[in-house]
A protein has these predicted regions:
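Bacterial N-terminal signal peptides
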Residues: 11-21
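A structural "domain/chain start" motif
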Residues: 22-104, 115, 214-225
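Bacterial N-terminal signal peptides that target proteins for export
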Residues: 2-12
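Solvent-exposed, acidic/flexible segments
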Residues: 55-63, 99, 103-107, 154, ...
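C-terminal/domain-edge helix-coil "capping" segments
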Residues: 22-43, 52, 129-131, 150-225
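Surface-exposed short loop/turn segments
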Residues: 98-169
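Structured loop/turn residues at beta-strand edges in well-structured enzyme cores
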Residues: 17, 40, 117-120
Length: 225
């Protein structure tokens, strides 16, 4: 296939390489308490994503990403917490948000298991990454002499998440942090497709984890307990 016959595709390819899958991100924080009442200890924080049978849930890999991005050993793995609290955090019975937690914690068995685990702070993550737009086309052929793909495809994705920090002991919301990232990915192809990916979910994870680190590092007040 003669590339000179397709200047439009070559121009789009050059544009895609120049843009390089750019991502724009926004982080916002609303603090409803001046500071944590008690500094986080080992295993005293759990990060949970929304899970429910209605098909809407926060991706487990995003929750894992945030947990692993937080420095230190204060974070209890989500899976370990869910297993210890079985069956109350399974998809069919899990709370839909922090507003449902007081009712759940009124159950003495639930409260005791959480206390035994030593978990003080719950970070509830709600949100998802979605494809918002896509355009272009690509055609691939296979022949005895070889094959290849020709075309240009773009797609835009938006990663939007909100983390609510909840004190399980005082049963109050300490603050909320939102992380939004959006970007456009490109896949030009002249024989071989070359994906140029905008990693919006990774950017949203990094921004949310960094802000949570700052939030959780705020000096604890003296009236801890």
């Amino acid at each position: 296939m003669n590339a000179r016959r397709h200047p439009r595709v070559l121009s789009l390819w050059a544009l895609a390489l120049a843009l390089g899958g750019c991502v724009s991100a926004t982080i916002e924080e609303v603090r409803t308490a001046p500071a944590l009442l008690e500094a986080p200890q080992e295993g005293s924080i759990v990060i949970l994503g929304r899970r429910h049978n209605n098909g809407y849930e926060t991706e487990s890999n995003f929750v894992d990403c945030v947990g692993k991005s937080l420095r230190g050993s204060a974070v209890l793995p989500e899976e370990a917490f869910i297993d210890a609290l079985y069956p109350w955090f399974e998809p069919r019975t899990a709370p839909l948000g922090t507003a449902d937690l007081p009712t759940l914690l009124a159950n003495e068995a639930v409260a005791k298991r959480i206390d035994d685990l030593g978990v003080r702070y719950m970070i509830w993550v709600d949100g998802a990454t979605n494809t918002t737009d896509q355009a272009g086309s690509m055609t691939c052929t296979i022949s005895p002499g070889g094959g290849g793909c020709f075309g240009f495809v773009t797609w835009a994705r938006d990663a939007s998440y909100e983390a609510t920090v909840w004190d399980l002991k005082t049963q109050q919301t300490l603050g909320r942090i939102s992380s939004d990232a959006n970007g456009t990915s490109y896949m030009p192809a002249m024989v071989v497709p070359v994906p140029i990916i905008a990693r919006v979910q990774a950017q949203a994870c990094s921004g949310l984890a960094d802000q949570l680190e700052t939030f959780l590092s705020a000096p604890a007040t003296e009236n801890a307990g």
